[in-house]
Amino acid sequence: MKTFSVTKSSVVFAMALGMASTAFAQDFCSNAQHSGQKVTITSNQTGKIGDIGYELWDENGHGGSATFYSDGSMDCNITGAKDYLCRAGLSLGSNKTYKELGGDMIAEFKLVKSGAQNVGYSYIGIYGWMEGVSGTPSQLVEYYVIDNTLANDMPGSWIGNERKGTITVDGGTYTVYRNTRTGPAIKNSGNVTFYQYFSVRTSPRDCGTINISEHMRQWEKMGLTMGKLYEAKVLGEAGNVNGEVRGGHMDFPHAKVYVKNGSDPVSSSSVKSSSSTDAPKSSSSKGNGNVSGKIDACKDVMGHEGKETRTQGQNNSSVTGNVGSSPYHYEIWYQGGNNSMTFYDNGTYKASWNGTNDFLARVGFKYDEKHTYEELGPIDAYYKWSKQGSAGGYNYIGIYGWTVDPLVEYYIVDDWFNKPGANLLGQRKGEFTVDGDTYEIWQNTRVQQPSIKGTQTFPQYFSVRKSARSCGHIDITAHMKKWEELGMKMGKMYEAKVLVEAGGGSGSFDVTYFKMTDKAHPLAQPEPESSSSEAKVESSSSTVALHAAPKMELKSGNFQVFDMQGRFLGTVKLDAGASVAQVLKANFKNAGIYMVKQGNFMQRVAVK
């Protein structure tokens, strides 16, 4: 029998590690305080501070305020609201079910509350939405795990149409209800009908840990269907259907939601958020302009990098191909004139035209016509460009692509030489707000015109931004969802690319920052160096094992990059004289802790 020796020092170390971890878990109940950057909100708004998604919403739009901190904590004040919600945590983007996150969703909270007047109902705990829930009205579910309240008593049987039973989670007993509600919901204008799921704790508590995933497992056993998670946030809510709540205060000096992989908690930065689709719970369709991850295309510097390839295209014919070893694809197409396109390995490109009847140049994702945008997404673009000259009678700058089955040509127009009008766009279908501005939505019909499938009759879909811009983020998926809500059917994706199109004139276009992401090519999300969850990771056994691994002496050449959850981010090249941190910063933009691997050795690298 093979035996293993264990030294006394290793046993002592393991015991100390376990005790430290336990102490940390209990510490926030007695020693919690707000820390980090903060933002104070006084009207309905969603946003991000650090890697924390937050929202303040009340039915009046002016019935309170909230201060959100970059450590996840928040301070919520009600001055006079019919229904008030204050929440912070994970914005998940409706991409995965709770089973697909790679671990359990865990919430920690510490609550300090003061009494409010005229409280009809109040829910303090966990809150979120799910999309794509089969068998439910509008495929939406609003869910709650309620651990406390501003009211005199915890919610009772009045909260739901259906009592499903009781469960025991995190040392407490919860009663589970399902309710059918018609009212405001995410991503909808006006009222819609949806289900609500509730876990209501029998005895309220003002501090503790909530295993959100365990509640969802128990809900499923009771026949409640789960969907794709839109969010999971610590919540303070209070309202009254017959008046206003006045004077309530819910302070959360500690609040955190993370995904726990095995024994290692993962901060909210490890889950890709939905960027601008994080619309507020209200009767308005207006969203916000937040960008997933930490990319700021307007400030970050990229420039033209890698091999330069120039093509003059071919009259009345598409010239296409891959952009170096990147995941991107290019295309140039025109009718007449003297035109060209120059593209670079990082996806940036230049284009020029002179005397053309119609000119298109574009770079982005080329798909196989087998999957919908929902299956491929979320799809996002980050860009910075400049333009000169003129572009004739019509022109579009933004996102462009096609779908098949049905055949559709689509545009998201963020910029122009001359703003396109109704004569080019067809029938106005509506408007919505995303990425910080309102877009008007139009549908046109092209009769027997050139297409990716030859000469065809097909619809064109347009989202046209009210104010032009030359840099920022475009949530492509949000536009497509809105089009379908308006009856504009999308098919299987052929492409999604950053485009310049000119209907004449003489001009040039230069994209100096370019990045696109989708499910297959997500935005890198390393764990923040300064987060409190990093302190926990430092004390975890798996991180100790990494520290115990032989440290490598980094040499010039290629090495692989991983985030702290072991997800592969890409391969980068280290040139002689450069530091690894500099190379990581240049390639991934985000500050944080990375793991780099060269040969059989791995090493942690901090990027500030």
Curated annotation (Swiss-Prot):
Keyword Transmembrane helix in record: no
Pfam hit, one: Glyco_hydro_11
Class in the EC hierarchy, top level: hydrolase
Signal peptide: 1-25
Active site: 142, 237, 409, 501
Pathway: Glycan degradation; xylan degradation
MF term (GO), any: endo-1,4-beta-xylanase activity
Protein name: Endo-1,4-beta-xylanase C
Organism: Fibrobacter succinogenes (strain ATCC 19169 / S85)
Lineage summary: Bacteria, Pseudomonadati, Fibrobacterota, Fibrobacteria, Fibrobacterales
